[in-house]
From Swiss-Prot:
This is Non-structural protein 5. It comes from Rotavirus A (isolate RVA/Human/United States/WI61/1983/G9P1A[8]) (RV-A). It holds the Pfam family Rota_NS26. It comes from the Viruses. Residues 17-36, 131-166 are annotated as: Disordered.
Amino acid sequence: MSLSIDVTSLPSISSSIFKNESSSATSTLSGKSIGRSEQYISPDVEAFNKYMLSKSPEDIGPSDSASNDPLTSFSIRSNAVKTNADAGVSMDSSTQSRPSSNVGCDQLDFSLNKGINVSANLDSCISISTDHKKEKSKKDKSRKHYPRIEADSDSEDYVLDDSDSDDGKCKNCKYKKKYFALRMRMKQVAMQLIEDL
């Protein structure tokens, strides 16, 4: 797997700050320009004094004292009048607003060129085991299949014995054969139940 990252041009930022001049800050990315142009007037004591002295005391109202600091209030109102925040400025037009000399101008221009190459080899081994015990459902567990027991037996397999019978009362009667067959069948059922438990 190979990953290649090439950053040839990052946004170029230029900024110029001038006293009593327009200040422009622009950035470009993928050919698109985003700009904002604002004009700020720094507080000037002389201009503030002229402004206040040109007005009569009767004309000075609450609008002239919007701030506790009259000098700041004057700067805020002047800034609000001369601000144009909706103007789009491109990189080309921002250079035209700069003066010919760099006196009183703080300028910052930078660009970054980087080439990054990353290569990596991925080796993977996956083994899947599909051996698992098949779980029986609850219905299958509750329903046990017992082997079928045949009740019919040949008379030759059973020896009729009169030892446990009353003397002279049951000698080779027809029920004795059925009794031994039933006893053998019950014995098999009992053994099967014991094995299941």
